[in-house]
Amino acid sequence: APDSAWGQRMHSAFNTQWSALGGDITAMTTLTSELSDNETIANSLATLQSESRIKEIEKAFEAPVDSQARRRTDLDSVVLLSPTPQMAREIRPLLRFHYAGKLPVYAPSTIYQNGSGIANRDLNGIQFVLPASALATDSSRSQPLHALGLDAAALIDHFDQARETTGTLLFGETGDLSVDTMGNVHRRLKPAVIARGKARAVL
């Protein structure tokens, strides 16, 4: 996450929710202006330490060693808390460079900019969530408002039924909607992955 108020809020919210679900955060890395992103990622994945050990062995034996630097092995996924597509496009290639390219990467929808197919290719493989309407081919800026209007109209017709019947779902344009007994509307988004620079639904 970036060293900013947004980054702190996102990390706190994610840590709280992940811990409530029984998850464990092995390490948390903050991107600051004091170090380059490359140095920060290298330190976080311990590839610099691995490279240093190889150099020490080569120095001790006065001969090259047929070995490749490795990342730490206690990670099973990466959560990239990026507020912008640009930041995510800079970090994703660095993960690949530092031998973490095969780890699943998850991120908020702030990383994705519809209609930027070529630029989005650096984000290929990242998984996130989007409203169903955002997975459509139409990239009009008015589309989110149109989708919200459609769902609002549909909820008006089924609001009381959804509130009184537990488990009722409305498969709307902005996500899967439900209403609790207090009348609060809950929304579940669609899982997506970036492939060939475009968001694709995860089936």
Region spans (language model):
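Extracytosolic ligand-binding ectodomains
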Residues: 1-203
